[in-house]
Each structure stands twice: as C-alpha cells, then as structure tokens.
Amino acid sequence: PPTRVVATWREVAAAAGERRCVVKSAGGPGRGVSIVVGTAEELRVERGLDPPFLVQDYVVAGEVDHKLYLVGDQVRGLLKPSPLAVGHTTEGAPFTPAPELVDLARQVRARLDLDFLGVDVLVSESGPVVVDVNDFPGYRGMPDVPELVADHLLARAAA
C-alpha cells in the first residue's frame, strides 16, 4: 500500500488525512514494535513511538499475516496472527504458500537483489499486498531454514 516516511507526529496526522492508516516506527528488528491505526483525527495525540515513522494506508484483510521467508529462490511460509488483532507475538504456524504468493515473494527478491529476506503479505479481497520487507529476517518458526541457509551459502561459495 502507499507508504510515507515522516519525521514528526504532526506529519503523521497530516499524512493520514481522512484515510485509516497504520503507523509504526521505521527501522529496527521488529521486536516490540508498536502499531497504531487511525485517521488524522484519531492520531492527534502522540503515541510514544520513536521517529521516524512509517505511515501506511490500512489494508482490509483477515486477522492473519502471511510471512514469506526466502533463502535464494526457496520460499517458506508462516501464518501469524496480525499484530493489529493480538499485538506482537512470535507464535505462528508453517504453511505452504500458494503459487501467487511464491511468485510475489520472488518478484520482491529479484527487485531488491537479496539472497535472504522476509516478505510480509496481507491477503485482501483484491489480492495479496506486500506490507513489509525485512533483509535477513529471524526465520523463527521455520524448521528447515538453517539447512537451506547453509546449502545456499555453500553453493554460493563454490560458484
């Protein structure tokens, strides 16, 4: 979705306007990240997040985040409860991503030219939407990723 980076909370409210937006601190590893949702009117009062801020149009989707983890061209999936529904959690369940999600994740990888990344996707009524990309994510909850990483690095070293 359209995303803006702003430096002050006043700019957060201006960027949101009448739209519902998701606001979070830019950067960092994602642990303990606070997310606030609202319109400019609802975002008048500063919420204690650290600047700079990401202001992202709200995507109407279910209460599940589709986390896609890539090691080279290999894509693994983890379903996690949305932090908007339950707050931050490390719990999730591995799943086999649909071909359209695999293709989307690979497109992001190709565009960024990264070997290791995480792509957070929400599935809305109009289709999947990338809401976050992490270079070298934690891969927590993905049982075969250590072997995938080792195999990928060995193959790259041998090339």
Where would I find each of the regions flagged by the language model?
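Short beta->alpha connector loops
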Residues: 6-10, 59-61, 115
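Hydrophobic residue at the +6 position relative to the catalytic HRD Asp in the kinase catalytic loop
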Residues: 119-121
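Phosphate-binding site of ATP-dependent enzymes
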Residues: 17-18, 27-112
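A conserved helix-loop-beta module that forms one wall/lid of the active-site cleft
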Residues: 1-34
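C-terminal active-site "lid" helix and adjoining low-complexity regulatory extension at the edge
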Residues: 110, 114, 123-159
